[in-house]
Amino acid sequence: MEPYVTAETLDARARAWLQEISPYNRHPMRLEAAASVLLVVDMQRFFLDPASPTYTAGGPAVMPRVRLLIDAFRGAGRPVIFTRHVHHPDGLDGGIMDWWWEGKCLEGSPESEIVPELAPLPGEKVVLKHRYSAFYDTDLETVLRCLKARDLVVCGVMTNLCCESTARDAYYRDYRVFFPADASGSVTEDLHRAALAGLAFGFAWVSLSADLAAQLAEAAPPGEGA
């Protein structure tokens, strides 16, 4: 499948997406840097390799924006949490997803790894999940409470599945959700655009990665985030 966006067209497309959803994107927020956490959802080879049956065509173009956010959070001394969508090789955790999807990402396989360009640092939390939402049957909520998080920035793939499901679950738990339109990707632009509209209408402030990075930098004490 051909990508609906490239690194060269991303800025223009992202501005168009924000303009399109502006009637719904009516809850502007600024990051509370001291209580913010970045969630990087499923940036794995399984979803970003063009040869994969689950290739996410919009994923490669947004990788630099995800990297921008990772660097911004690390530079501000704020936590970065990664997720990996995996299933046990014995298939016992597949459930309906076995029937719904072609192929699955097996725990321990090379395809299950996060792409090297975005790899977690030693000590950074990696959540292993078996369903779309990073909150479902994981320890993510416990970790966030221990971090005293209030603001969550959700990025990664796919916009309309794991990212949206995670954002919804975060909202249900009373977190403020920030969703950068240019740091998430889906299989088609229609799916991406529809998800952004739903997010803006119901449970997230949809903005741009550079705006969020700038807010972190502005809040950093002198000497940090440089």
What are these regions (language model features)?
Residues 161, 184-188, 213:
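Short gly/pro/ser/thr-enriched loop/turn and capping motifs at secondary-structure boundaries
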Residues 188-200:
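Active-site-proximal loop->helix
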Residues 160-166:
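Short glycine/serine/threonine-rich phosphate/pyrophosphate-binding segments
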Residues 153-156, 176-189:
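A short glycine-rich beta-strand->turn/loop micro-motif centered on a GG-aromatic cluster
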Residues 108-156:
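Internal catalytic-core helix/loop-beta-alpha segment
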